Amino acid sequence: MNVILGVTGGVAAYKALTLTSLMVKAGHEVQVVFTPNANAFVEKLPFEALSGRRVLDSHFDQQSDPIAHIRLADWADKVIIAPLTANTMAKLAYGMADNFLTTLALAYDDSLYLALAMNDQMYANVYVQENLMRLKREGHIILAPSSGLLACGHTGQGRLLEPEEIYSLCFEETKKDYFGKNVL
């Protein structure tokens, strides 16, 4: 299966490396795409070593392939964004395409798998919840964050699911109908 893994700029971005490894070990072709802020939290090289592909980001050379976002959206059997920050969630909810990942997501013609990760107060914010409901109504598959100790020191709902849980929900459970449902 051809999989796009979108990595956004949050502290939980390091977990995407394990998710990449799980997918590659299972025989999936994985193309990692970073948002500009992902670079502040994780390095590209480990993702490139595991996936065997160059990580694409907003600095992708559009001159060598000006419609790369369309080509990749057509190539992908599945698009997973893990972690999904409140910032990128808002962009997706309102159709903003200001970086390579959000542009690719708009071009993809199937449901996105969205694994949320953010501070508990951000997650509870009315605007974040409205964006979440909008994405659910559009048919995207929401992998809700778990509760526990967060990077900020708070305890609450906002932790990115463990990579093994994300993998299971995205691949082992694909026969179930998750259309517009909040998983977990």
Residue ranges and their predicted role:
Residues M1-Y113, D120-L184:
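A cross-family phosphate/adenosyl-ligand binding-site feature
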